[in-house]
């Protein structure tokens, strides 16, 4: 199907993956560039995700851009001023394009497993803010926010409790939140935005200076 939804400022979109990998590949012109990579992807699900992110990037940017990877695995666009972030979850792909270097997006399908692993990524202060009536959704927002922040800072040996911090917030279906990191030598704070959809949660970074809208 086409883009599930698209946002222009910042520029991002979510694609619901209903096509086969062959169908997705047919939507791209630079097929010969992709085949060597696809041959190394063993599962159909991963091939679908890999291709869907490129089809979505084409839809967002208006042209077919090749994705390269830094040594740490972070994707980038060699011939573009945009900075790129990509995320996948069960049946969905998300792509974010921003002019600022620190760009991060994360999307997660609903799963109660988040309740079992909350102690691995939530600080006591963050955990105390979780709405018991919306615990799964609230925790998924925290998780996605920290995943997006992790992508933004591009550091190794990151502890999600010690180094990645989300200012506790009251749950709502969408809002902006504040995040900061203490892993780098020059800690930074960031503004993130999230949305809770019927099947998934996603969080994305906002341009510097966006501030918090209440």
Question: Where are the regions that the model predicts?
Answer:
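Core catalytic alpha/beta fold that binds nucleotide/phospho-ligands
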Residues: 1-214
């Amino acid at each position: 199907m086409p883009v599930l939804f698209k946002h222009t400022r910042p520029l991002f979109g979510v694609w619901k993956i209903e096509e086969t990998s062959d169908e997705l590949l047919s939507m791209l012109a630079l097929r010969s560039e992709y085949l060597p990579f696809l041959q190394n992807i063993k599962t159909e699900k991963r091939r679908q995700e890999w291709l869907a992110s490129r089809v979505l990037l084409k839809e967002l940017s208006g042209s077919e851009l090749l994705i390269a990877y830094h040594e740490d695995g972070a994707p980038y666009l060699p011939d573009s001023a945009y900075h790129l972030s990509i995320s996948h979850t069960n049946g969905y792909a998300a792509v974010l394009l921003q002019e600022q270097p620190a760009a991060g997006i994360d999307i997660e399908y609903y799963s109660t497993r988040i309740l079992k692993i909350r102690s691995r990524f939530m600080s006591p202060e963050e955990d105390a803010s979780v709405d018991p009536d919306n615990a799964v959704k609230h925790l998924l927002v925290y998780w996605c926010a920290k995943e997006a922040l992790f992508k933004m800072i591009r550091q190794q040996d990151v502890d999600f409790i010690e180094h990645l911090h989300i200012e506790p917030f009251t749950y709502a279906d969408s809002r902006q939140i504040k995040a900061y990191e203490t892993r780098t030598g020059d800690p930074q704070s960031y503004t993130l935005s999230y949305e809770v959809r019927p099947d998934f949660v996603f969080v994305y970074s906002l341009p510097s200076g966006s501030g918090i809208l209440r």
